[in-house]
C-alpha cells in the first residue's frame, strides 16, 4: 500500500469537557452519539469515531456560554441537525462557512459549553 493509502500515523487521543452537571452532561454526550467506556462521579470517558476519547471531568464551576475547546464532525450535517432537534437539543440554524467549504451548527451542552458541529471534511482515504 502506498503511503497516501495508509491511515495517518497520529490521531487525537483525548478531548476534555469540564462540567458541573456530570449526569446531565453524560446524558448529552450519549445522546449526540458517543459510546460510554467508563462513567464515574468525577470522570467519565466516551469513545468517538477513530478511537478519540471525550473525557467529562467534574469541576466546581463552569463558565456558561464559553466555546468548547474542540469541535466535532459528522457525516450528514442535516440529518444530525434534525435528530438533535428531535431530541430537544435546540441546535442553531445551519450556516455556511464558504471560506473553509463547510457548513456548521452549534449546540449548548448542559454545563453551558457551546459545541460546533461541522460537515465532514474527511479526504476519502483511510482514517
Please tell me what each predicted stretch does.
Residues 2-4, 32, 56-59, 92:
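A generic local structural motif
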Amino acid at each position: 500500500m502506498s503511503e497516501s493509502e495508509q491511515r495517518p500515523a497520529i490521531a487525537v487521543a483525548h478531548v476534555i469537557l469540564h462540567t458541573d452537571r456530570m449526569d446531565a452532561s453524560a446524558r448529552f454526550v450519549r445522546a449526540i452519539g458517543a459510546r460510554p467506556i467508563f462513567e464515574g462521579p468525577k470522570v467519565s470517558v466516551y469513545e468517538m469515531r477513530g478511537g478519540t476519547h471525550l473525557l467529562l471531568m467534574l469541576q466546581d464551576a463552569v463558565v456558561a456560554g464559553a466555546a468548547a475547546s474542540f469541535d466535532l464532525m459528522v457525516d450528514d450535517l442535516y440529518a444530525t441537525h434534525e435528530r438533535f432537534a428531535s431530541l430537544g437539543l435546540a441546535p442553531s440554524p445551519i450556516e455556511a462557512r464558504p471560506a473553509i467549504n463547510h457548513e456548521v451548527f452549534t449546540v449548548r451542552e448542559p454545563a453551558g459549553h457551546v459545541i460546533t458541529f461541522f460537515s465532514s471534511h474527511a479526504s476519502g482515504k483511510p482514517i
